[in-house]
Amino acid sequence: WENRLRFGLEVLERIKETISIPVIVRLSADEIFPKGLKLDDMIRLSVALEQKGVDAIHVSSGSVCETPPWYFQHMSISKGKTWEFAAKIKSKVTIPVIAVGQINEKHDPEKILKDGLADVVAIGRPLIADPDFVGKVLGDIRSPIRPCACCLEGCIGGVRSGQGLMCVVNPEVGKEEKKLEKISKPRKVAVVGGGLAGMEAALVLRERGHLVTLFEKKTLGGLFNLAYRAPRKANLEKFKKYFVDEVTEKIDVIFEEAHPDKLMKNYETVILATGSLPKTPSIPGLKEWHWAEILEPDKTPKNKRGVIVGGGFIGAEIAEVLVKNGNDVTIIKRSEEIAPRMEVMSRNFLLKSLKELKVKIVTGADVVRKKGGTLYLSIDGKEGRIENVDFVVYTKGMIPENSMENRLKEKAELFLVGDCKEVGRAMDAIHSAYECALSV
């Protein structure tokens, strides 16, 4: 053990001899893989570091190579686990211990300090999602915190893809030079659709001074109301709730279907945020099918045999939920990859789960027809079949729902945002709505 520590401790001694500022060591309390460093090792290390004059210990978890979801505190990791590691180390040292990881709600810092889990909290991604996070926690700024979803899609994903730092919930990140300017001549604006794009557009328009009315025929949140029902995505409900609460408080919402004639008569500008619809299957004999609405608890079958047509992330996540409800599920997919466009850490968790659940996946295949309870397939040019099928879920993409566009575009200033313009991710919907609202 002493030999393992020697190099690091000698470097530390030299640093302490050279500088007079505090030295903080960040360490992973548990790397969460079989041959990785464990909590007992890191407690011993922390004690040794204190003896060598380290001023504080900053406690994270995971390994960037072996267990990145823990290292980056992905939403699939239970909140507070790393705080517990910090508390274990704190109980063995007298120097300050710093906790980190998913500290993204107003009560989190107070809980960590009050419960004695750590002496200091460190905050990273929540400041990307909401730069005023600290002021709101302290009560100096009295408005709701825009919560980091811990999804890693904009921040880590943006950097990895070469697009630069972004954020799903905060479209201003990376665009700080664009000022949200107040409008000199407010317009009466109707936003049609209360999904993520519609809510973001309405809030930004209102902040700029426009007179905004939002029309929603069902419930605020749109299709995103299904997103957090997928495995390991419960965190997304907080992010949706933030938008719904903000819109409910600040925007005039009319819960009814918008009619083009009334929109043209009563509003100067119309923003369509009507989202998208699932593609309709053209499979002979298939008269009834499901889409992601099957994730709603009262609509999820149990102990049945089902086939999912399409192996993108929506189809794959639905498969996981259905199997966990006792269903025998087969995914039919034309290409070889499952969920190829999914955020990488979420995808790795998903693929691991599908493997553990022994979900049957047939690639290179198409459904040719359905007759009775039998689905007939074409598998690499050969015929196959699945018998005794109780239900079919069709998840082969979405199409924009912009049926009002033609009636409105000739008589009103019209903008399209979100999926009704181009089907994309939650980040695409929010960012396109933000950009549009700045231009009105």
Model-derived regions, located:
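Flavin-dependent oxidoreductase catalytic cores
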Residues: W1-V192, L196, A201-V204, V212
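Residue-level detector of alpha-helix initiation sites
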Residues: I103, G195-A197, T219, S276, ...
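A conserved short coil-to-beta-strand element within the FAD-binding core of flavoproteins
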Residues: I254-M264, L277, T363-T374
